[in-house]
Amino acid sequence: MNRAPLALVLPLVVACAARSAAPPSAAAGRDLRLPQERHLANVRQLTFGGENAEAYFSFDGRELIFQSTREGRACDQEYVMGADGSSPRLVSTGKGRVTCGYFFPGGDRILYASTHETSPGCPPPPDMSHGYAWALYDYQLYVARADGSDLHPLAQAPGYNAEATISVDGWIVFTSTRDGDLDLYKMRLDGSGLVRLTDTPGYDGGAFFSADGKRIVYRASRPKDAQELAQYRALLAQKLVRPTQLEIWVMDADGKNQRQVTHLGAASFAPFFHPDGRRIIFASNVGDPKGRNFDLYLVNDDGSGLERITYNETFDGFPMFSPDGKKLVFASNRNGSRPGETNVFIADWVE
């Protein structure tokens, strides 16, 4: 559930309406790069229709796993397609709400979070009467073959268990409320060796390993005073979290040397290491005084050298570099068939 933080992109992750996928348009072969986007070339749209996001490369860079409401689905399910957008196919159960798919090293298995056992239908959206918040559904982690077969649960615990990604050397990092807060944990691919990585009050999530598996980048909220902490805990008791203040953090893969990278005072999320291990790409609304528009930014891992990457007037988010660093996949509202439609795009990365 590496969600986009504000109501502008709410249909992407919370109130998905049933829609059927539209056929590819001329955009499939047209460069959708904006003039200011000097680090991007050959921006191509890979999905058309429905809501599509959180597309992540396989370790060989040949395939993408992503979540979508295509085929008239009311809730996100997981799909796999070629890195060129070819042959999309359902790999989750078609029940409940599904999020955060990821490939195992080797590409023969996948991991995702789903509510299909606790809520076979779409779980209800959160009550927004007290302000915008994310619902912490009762997600559990599941492992399956790459075609969706042989499904089984992994490291089950009551509450929220999601936002799982995998390192090249066979570790899973994920967010869970199993100890009462939204913290990061890691474990082996079979669920053994479970270790809690964070224990500071606040939301720690959206974690990814560096290419060598030695470090983790993640987003975090940190209540600044007793009042904010009380508000955070009150929402958590209702299975909600408010994501309006998120910063990017890094730590060693064992949880040591936790360090805040950004100090933007904004909603910054979806961080991912460049394969060089020195730079981090992420999404943020820091450039919009109204907090509604999200773009991609690049920053050095020490917080220096902040650079804006995309200049779309609506939403760009969920960036991921290909393993060789030559491609960037991301989700965007650009070129939608209707306002707010989110699709998956791929671009050449230009240094």
Positions of predicted regions on the chain:
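Short loop/turn segments that connect beta-strands within beta-propeller blades
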Residues: 82-86, 145-149, 188-192, 252-256, ...
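Bacterial N-terminal signal peptides
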Residues: 7-15
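Beta-strand-rich domains and repeat architectures in extracellular enzymes and scaffolds
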Residues: 31-33, 41-74
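Residue-level detector of Asp-centered blade-edge/turn motifs that repeat once per structural unit
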Residues: 59-60, 105-106, 167-168, 211-212, ...
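Hydrophobic beta-strand positions that form the internal "hydrophobic ladder"
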Residues: 64-65, 110, 172-173, 216, ...
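Blade/loop signatures of beta-propeller domains
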Residues: 23-41, 139
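A flexible loop/linker signature enriched in serine peptidases of the S9 family
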Residues: 48-51, 68-78, 93-98, 113-140, ...
